[in-house]
UniProtKB/Swiss-Prot annotation:
Record protein name field: Inositol 2-dehydrogenase
Stored InterPro entries: Gfo-Idh-MocA_inositol_DH, Gfo/Idh/MocA-like_OxRdtase_C, Gfo/Idh/MocA-like_OxRdtase_N, MI/DCI_dehydrogenase, NAD(P)-bd_dom_sf
EC primary class: oxidoreductase
Keywords, sorted A to Z: NAD, Oxidoreductase
One function term, GO molecular function aspect: inositol 2-dehydrogenase (NAD+) activity
Length: 336
């Protein structure tokens, strides 16, 4: 069986997912694309030699009777509106992170999904499908290192665009750690606080780096370094300290060179390459389940809502300098 999909938003990640769905993932055919920038979607179709309908308005794509699944890779601000429209048309949704830029918009998606009476949305928190993170979770869940006590994470990018601002370090960067730590530890957050260390002299458009401390409901402390202009590469790190030992996210495999009294390995620069397998696996799982008549099993709309509420608290802490409470309602039975 092959499901027919439409992609809304053919920018950097949308174009990459177009290639992925056309050339790597089985059980899906891309039949329509949409982008507000004239010519962008068609250029991507031409680049990958794909034949599909090219729409300017996402409503037209959603209303296309051939489209069964809507992939949302548009601007973050558009995610909620597109998701709600797709759900109102009773179509399955794969939405890149974040689900929405506000908790209120996430709630709109949750309400639209629940009206259909079944899970129809998966959020693109791809780290849950990364082999290293899966190994880390298996170690934690097995009890091998005992109860987790504290976690240290690092999310570094070599550079970012001038338009990238201070809150985006939370909404677009830390959002991955917010979700993956919640998943690894199977806990919600209680409080958050954002610190601004010494400012990088190479950055003038935002506060960079940032240090985020999150406390879970059981008291686990999580410290994440966010540095989006570190210069040297794309560097993701996570280690979990437990009562009996420590588990660490494996580094990306890279051939080592011994030469001229030096030992060196490469560090990736492109985030798409770091998680290329995770992206492939998450989409294959999504379409395998839908083709088998099963609901999506990946990150839910509720996970997207939890991440948004936590991110809102972090941004508030950026502004106040205080520890902020993460006010999260009880999880609906629909998502249990």
């Amino acid at each position: 069986m092959t499901l027919k999909a439409g992609i809304v938003g053919i920018g950097m990640i949308g174009s990459d997912h177009l290639r992925r769905l056309a050339n790597t993932v089985s059980g899906v055919e891309v039949v329509a694309v949409c982008d507000i920038v004239a010519g962008r979607a068609q250029a991507a179709l031409d680049k990958y030699a794909i034949e599909a309908k090219d729409y300017n308005d996402y409503h037209d794509l959603i209303n296309d009777k051939d489209v069964e699944v809507v992939i949302i890779t548009a601007s973050n601000e558009a995610h909620a509106d597109v998701a709600v429209a797709a759900l109102n048309a009773n179509k399955y949704v794969f939405c890149e992170k974040p689900l929405a830029v506000t908790a209120a918009d996430c709630q709109r998606v949750i309400e639209a999904e629940q009206k259909n009476g079944k899970r129809m949305v998966q959020i693109g928190f791809m780290r849950r499908y990364d082999k290293g993170y899966v190994q880390l979770k298996n170690i934690i869940d097995s009890g091998e290192i005992g109860q987790p006590l504290m976690v240290h994470g690092r999310h570094y990018n070599a550079s970012t665009v001038p338009e990238y601002k201070t809150p985006q370090a939370i909404y677009e960067t830390l959002i991955h750690e917010i979700d993956v730590m919640h998943w690894l530890l199977n806990e919600d957050y209680k409080t958050v606080k954002v610190y601004f260390p010494r400012q990088s002299s190479l950055v003038t458009t935002l506060r960079d780096p940032q240090l985020v401390v999150m406390e879970t409901t059981s008291g686990i402390n999580i410290v994440v370094e966010v540095f989006v202009n570190c210069q040297y590469g794309y560097d993701i790190h996570c280690d979990v300290t437990g009562e009996k030992g420590m588990a660490e996210l494996p580094t990306v495999a890279s051939a080592a060179v011994r030469k001229a009294a030096k030992y060196s390995t490469d560090i990736l620069v492109d985030w798409k390459q770091r998680f290329i397998d995770a992206y492939d696996i998450e989409f294959q799982d999504f379409f395998d389940r839908l083709n088998a008549g099963l609901p999506p099993a990946g990150p839910t709309s509720w996970d997207g809502y939890l991440a948004a509420v936590t991110a809102d608290a972090c941004v508030k802490s950026q502004e106040t300098g205080n520890t902020e409470i993460v006010e999260l309602p009880s999880k609906p039975d629909f998502y249990k």
